Amino acid sequence: MAKEVAGLIKLQIKGGAANPSPPVGPALGSKGINIMEFCKQFNARTQDKAGKILPVIITYYADKSFDFVIKTPPVAIQLLEVAKVKSGSAEPNRKKVAELTWEQIRTIAQDKMVDLNCFTVDAAMRMVAGTARSMGIAVKGEFPVNN
């Protein structure tokens, strides 16, 4: 018989750096989940992604056991890394903080494709480019048309 799902918790944690302090401790402790067990498992699975912010979806069950799925880093974080800037623009319509090429956008879109709700790389590229524009990061040239 399948376990009864009691709920979901969504967090963003740095890879390899989960510890019982906030936000992890209070979020898991209030649901009765073993915090140290989660931290050990998460840190073991994210050693290769140390320092990167990773979204994690934790499914916890009525018997206090849990499973979790680690997603790819958010698009905004990836854009900041590729553009080599610390933050987006406070006025994205007026002040641009960086400029990316469509090839860089394609790389991010292909990396994030598994987590996005789109079917083609072109659609994913448009989503990533929209996020970049809203952060004050310009995209060079026109959208490449594949023939």
Swiss-Prot record:
Report the protein's function.
Forms part of the ribosomal stalk which helps the ribosome interact with GTP-bound translation factors.
Q: Which SUPFAM superfamilies match?
A: Ribosomal L11/L12e N-terminal domain, Ribosomal protein L11, C-terminal domain
Q: What's the PTM story here?
A: One or more lysine residues are methylated.
> What is the name listed in the Swiss-Prot or TrEMBL entry for this protein?
Large ribosomal subunit protein uL11
Which family does the similarity line name?
Belongs to the universal ribosomal protein uL11 family.
The highest taxon in the source lineage is: Bacteria
Q: Which Pfam families match?
A: Ribosomal_L11, Ribosomal_L11_N
InterPro entries xref list: Ribosomal_uL11, Ribosomal_uL11_bac-typ, Ribosomal_uL11_C, Ribosomal_uL11_C_sf, Ribosomal_uL11_CS, Ribosomal_uL11_N, Ribosomal_uL11_N_sf
A Gene Ontology annotation in the biological process aspect, one of them, is: translation
**Subunit (UniProt):** Part of the ribosomal stalk of the 50S ribosomal subunit. Interacts with L10 and the large rRNA to form the base of the stalk. L10 forms an elongated spine to which L12 dimers bind in a sequential fashion forming a multimeric L10(L12)X complex.
Alphabetized, the UniProt keywords read: Methylation, Ribonucleoprotein, Ribosomal protein, RNA-binding, rRNA-binding
One GO MF annotation is:
structural constituent of ribosome
What does the entry list under GO cellular component?
cytosolic large ribosomal subunit
HAMAP family named in the record: Ribosomal_uL11
